[in-house]
Amino acid sequence: MFYATYFFVFGIYMPYWPLWLNDIGLTPVEIGWVLAGAFWIKVVVQPVVAHVADTTGRTKILTAVLMGMSAIGFAILSDLQSFWPIFLITLITAACYQPVLPIMESVILNFAKIGNLRYGHIRLWGSVTFIIATLGGGWLFDGGRSDRIIWFLVVGMTLVSLCCLLIPNQAQFERTKSRIKTHAKLFLSPLFIFFLITTGLIHISHSVLYGFGTLYWRSIGHSETIIGLFWSIGVLAEIVLFTVVGRHEKQVGYLFLLLLAAAAAVARWPLLAIFDSQIAIIVLQTLHGFTFGAAHLGAMAFLTKHVPKEISATGQSLYYTLIGGIFSGCMLPLAGKLYSDLSGSAFFIMSCFAGCSLISLLVLS
C-alpha cells in the first residue's frame, strides 16, 4: 500500500508540478530553482532523519508524521503565486517528504531479504499507480485545469501518511544502533564512490525530462492528455523490466544493469531532441524502463549486497542524498537555463552525462 499511494502522488508531482508552477507565472529558470531546492534540502535533512530511523527503529510514526506535514505544506503552497514564498515553503515541505522513501525502501528491502521476496516485484506496484496517476492527470488537468494539481497532491500526501502506519517498524526486523564510524571504510571506499558517481551521472541525465519534459511537449503541440500517455508509457516500460528482471534478480548483477541504463540513456536523449511526433516519443519513452528502471534496480542490488542491514537506512539515505540531493540539486537550475535557451536541444547535453557514465562503467567491467 505504501508504494501504491506514494507513487500515485509522485505520478502527479513529477509530470504536473512544473506545469502548475508555469501556469501561475514562474519562468523556466525559476521553476528550475524551485525543483532544485526540493533536492538540496535532502543533503541536510535526509541523513539526520535516516540516523534517527536507524537508532530508534520507529519508522512507522516518523514517516507518517513527515508525510502529514508534507500535505500541510502543499496546502499552504496553493495560496502562493510569487517565486520567493514558493521557493521557501517548497524547501520546508520537501524537508518533510524527501526522507520518507529511502527509509521505507530500507525497511522493505530488509523485509524482502527475510521473507525471500523479490524487490522488483514489490516495487512494480508503485509503477502501476504512477501510470494511473499520469494518465488520469493528463485527462483531469487538460484544458487549463492545472489548478487542481496541488489539491491532488494534498490528498495524496495524506493517504501516504496513513499507509506509513501499516508498514512494520525497523525494530521488528533487527533493531541495532548505527555504527557509522565502523562502516566509514565502506562509504569512503573507491567502489562505493565510483558507484555514486556513475549512478549519479545516469540520474542527472534525466534532469531536462523530469523538470521540463511536460512543458516541452506542450510547447510543440501535444495536449496534457497525450503528455500523460507519454509519461505512462515510460513507467509501463519500468513495470516490464521490473517483472522480467525480478525473476532473475539474484542472477543479474548490478554492473550489467547500470551498463544497460547508461547505454540506453546515451541513445534516448538525442533522439528525443530530434523526433517530436507522438509515435516517435511513445517509442522513445519505452527506453525509460532501461534508463531509470535498470539504473534503480542496479543501485538497489549494489546497496543490498554491500551495505550491512543495521545501517541500511543510512546507506539508502546517503545514496538518495548524494544522487537526488547534491547531483540533482546542482543540475536542475542548469537544466532550467538550458531549456530556456535551447528548448528541446537541451536533451543533447543530457546525453553527454550518460556517455561519461557509460565510459566509466565499461572501463570497470
Where are these regions (language model features)?
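Structural signature of the two symmetry-related core transmembrane helices
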Residues: 61-75, 154, 256-271
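Symmetry-related core transmembrane helices of the 12-TM Major Facilitator Superfamily/SLC fold
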Residues: 148-166, 346-364
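Helix-to-loop junctions at the C-terminal end of transmembrane segments
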Residues: 44-58, 141-142, 240-253, 339
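Cytoplasmic helix-loop-helix junction between adjacent transmembrane helices
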Residues: 91-125
